[in-house]
Design a protein with these regions (language model features):
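Short coil/turn connectors at secondary-structure junctions
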Residues: 68-69, 80-85, 98-100, 106-107, ...
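Acidic/histidine-rich catalytic neighborhood of metal-dependent amide-processing enzymes
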Residues: 118-189, 208
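Short acidic, glycine/serine/threonine-rich loops at helix termini
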Residues: 98-100, 158-163, 200
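Catalytic-core environment of secreted peptidases
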Residues: 75-119
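Short pre-catalytic strand/loop immediately N-terminal to key active-site residues, enriched for Gly-Thr
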Residues: 111-120, 231-234, 265
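N-terminal hydrophobic or amphipathic helices/low-complexity stretches enriched
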Residues: 5, 10-45
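Metal-dependent amide/peptide-bond hydrolase catalytic core
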Residues: 28, 180-287
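A non-catalytic alpha/beta surface segment that caps or lines the substrate-entry region
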Residues: 43-81
C-alpha cells in the first residue's frame, strides 16, 4: 500500500487507540512499574501484559548471573518476504527500585511516589514495543517477520545482550528503545602503549557510528515523516544494547522512549510519549 494509505490507516488506529485502549496503556504501565520484581518473565503476567496473538514469546537460556530470568527472544511470523527488523529493550532497572509505586496524573504524567525510580528506563521501551506490535496486528496490514529481544543486565554493562546467541537473529537492522535526553560518556575499547614501563605515544578509542545513509536511519526518518513526527538524529556517548548488535554485524539506532530524569527518584514519562513510541514501532514494522 502507499505511504498515504498507511498514514490514514494509522490515523484511524490512533483514534480508536485513544478512545478505547488509552486507559489500558497507561494502566498497564502503572501496574508494570509498580510490580514487586525486576524481571519481565515473572512480572508481565502480574502487570496484565500478555503476548500478542501468534507471537512466540519464549524464555531463552540467558546469561544467569544471580538473577531469576534470562534474555527473552520473541519471533512473530509475517506474511511478507524480506529481512525482519528486531526491536530491543532491557528488563532490569537501577536502584532504588524496591517498593516502587507509580502515580498517574490527570495530565498524563507518570512518576514514582518520590522515594524510588519509576522504571521507565526501560519499561517504557518494553511497553511501546508490545503495543506497537499490537497496533500492526489490529490494523490487519500484512507485515514481515518481527523479532523482539528483551534483555537482562543492561545496567550492568550490557551483560545480557553481550552473551546472547545472535545466531537466532535473522534481522539485519535493530531499534533499541533506550535513549534519554542526556547520557554519560562511555568508552567501549581503549588501545595504547607497548609496555608497562614506557609512556605510550598515543591512545586509540574505538567508537561505533551508524552511517546516515544506512537503512535503519532512512527507515526511521521515513516513519517519522509518515506519522508527522519531528524526529531528529543525534550522537550519544552512552553504552546500550545497540553496542552488542553492532558487534554482531547488525546495524541499528537507539530510539527515544520517553523517559526523563532516568536513574533518579525524579524519573517520569508521559502517556503521550508511550502512544507515540508505540505508533513509531508500528510504522517501522510496516515499512
Amino acid at each position: 500500500c502507499s505511504e498515504k494509505e498507511q498514514s490514514n490507516c494509522f490515523k484511524r488506529i490512533r483514534a480508536c487507540w485513544n478512545g478505547i485502549m488509552g486507559k489500558s496503556l497507561s494502566k498497564t504501565f502503572v501496574r508494570r512499574t509498580a510490580a514487586a520484581c525486576r524481571n519481565c518473565q515473572s512480572t508481565c503476567p502480574k502487570a496484565g501484559i500478555t503476548p500478542a496473538p501468534r507471537a512466540d514469546f519464549s524464555l531463552r537460556p540467558g546469561a544467569y548471573y544471580g538473577g531469576d530470568t534470562g534474555n527473552i527472544f520473541a519471533v512473530l511470523d509475517g506474511e511478507l518476504e524480506g529481512d525482519p527488523v528486531i526491536f530491543c529493550a532491557h528488563m532490569d532497572v537501577v536502584e532504588p527500585w524496591s517498593g516502587k509505586k507509580s502515580v498517574l496524573e490527570k495530565d498524563g504524567t507518570i512518576h514514582s511516589a518520590g522515594d524510588t525510580v519509576l522504571g521507565a528506563d526501560d519499561i517504557s521501551g518494553i511497553l511501546e514495543i508490545l503495543y506497537g506490535v499490537q497496533l500492526v496486528l489490529d490494523s490487519g496490514k500484512p507485515h514481515k517477520k518481527i523479532e523482539i529481544l528483551f534483555t537482562i543486565g543492561e545496567e550492568l554493562y550490557v551483560k545480557g545482550s553481550d552473551v546472547f546467541d545472535y545466531s537466532k537473529v535473522t534481522a539485519k537492522q535493530a531499534y533499541v528503545l533506550d535513549l534519554s535526553e542526556e547520557t554519560t560518556f562511555n568508552i567501549g575499547t581503549i588501545q595504547g602503549g607497548t609496555a608497562t614501563n614506557i609512556v605510550p605515544d598515543c591512545c586509540v578509542l574505538t567508537a561505533y557510528e551508524t552511517p546516515l545513509e544506512s537503512k535503519s536511519v532512512t527507515d526511521f526518518q521515513k516513519a517519522c515523516e509518515i506519522l508527522g513526527f519531528s524526529g531528529g538524529l543525534t550522537g550519544t556517548f552512552g553504552g546500550s544494547d545497540n553496542n552488542s548488535f553492532a558487534k554482531n554485524g547488525i546495524e541499528g539506532l537507539v530510539l527515544s522512549n520517553g523517559m526523563y530524569n532516568a536513574h533518579s527518584t525524579r524519573e517520569y514519562t508521559t502517556v503521550d510519549d508511550l502512544y507515540k513510541g508505540a505508533e513509531l514501532i508500528g510504522q517501522l514494522i510496516l515499512l
